[in-house]
Structures are given as C-alpha cells and as structure tokens.
Amino acid sequence: MKAISSWHVGVSAEAYAAAIFARYGYDVSVQYGANQPEYDLIATSGDLMLKISVKGSQDGSWGLTQGYKKGCDYHTATAKWLAAHHKKTIFCLVQFKDTAPNEMPRIYLASPVEIAERLNASAGGRGETILYENHTWGPRAAGSGTTDRIPDEWMISAERLAYMFSTYGQ
C-alpha cells in the first residue's frame, strides 16, 4: 500500500486507539481540535483514569525526541523529553507498517520512563531520538549489529491494560 499523509496516520492512530480501549471495555473520551497538550485520549476504569498520548507511524518507528536534541547528546535529549512528560501519561504507539487498510495495526502501550529506557539503550547504548519497532543497526552505525525492538510485553492486551491502569491510573 502506498504511504498516506501524516495527518491521515494521526487520525487513524487515534481512532484505532480509542476503538481498542473501548473494545476492551474501557470508557474513552477523545479530544478533538488542534493538537491538545500532553494527551489525546482519556480512558477510565471505575475510579481510575489514564491520559493517553497517541503516536502513529507507517515506517516502523516513532520520532520522539528530535526537538530536544539541539546542542546535546542523545541521553540528554531523552532526559529533557522525559522531564516534559507527566509520569502518569502513557503512550499508545500505533504501527501501520506492513498492514493492509482492512487490517488492524500493531498497538503498544508504554510509559514515558519505559520509552526513555529504550531510547537510551538504542544503537548499542549510544542512544537515539527515534523509537524503533524492530531495527538492526548496519555495519557503519554506532550500534553495529545490535537490534532495537519494542518489548513483547508492550503489545496491547488485557494484562497490559490492567497493568497500565493499576500503575499509572489516577
């Protein structure tokens, strides 16, 4: 399938995220309008609420910390990115790469701290601004021969959702 615009990726990612939370039985509220600060969705379970920032991608990666990189190393950029995000906001990472329009994308849930740990470990520990779903570094790269991969436990599931609500629910 040909690539779609970043706007279509974002709208699709938010719609899939809202749908999957609802499908698991959570109440979902969607923010509409210009980019809202910090989060795109709110999901509730009883008295617990999660603020959810949705990030969509169609290339196997999510660029997250580039805006913090100017004049510093990857680890400092990641620390700045982490400081800018509330620790109770979770990320819903939606990946459309290698999916047909009528197929579900892969969906992952992670906290800012979990993402920062992956970014810092990326490229053999050098760090990176991009979170990769599954990327092996080539022979000329800083992390030559290493593979960055989203942990399997981040894949959305009833267990992952229960963990997120019990750990990060407000």
Question: Language-model segments: what does each one mean?
Answer:
Residues 1-37, 42-170:
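Mixed-charge (Asp/Glu-Lys/Arg
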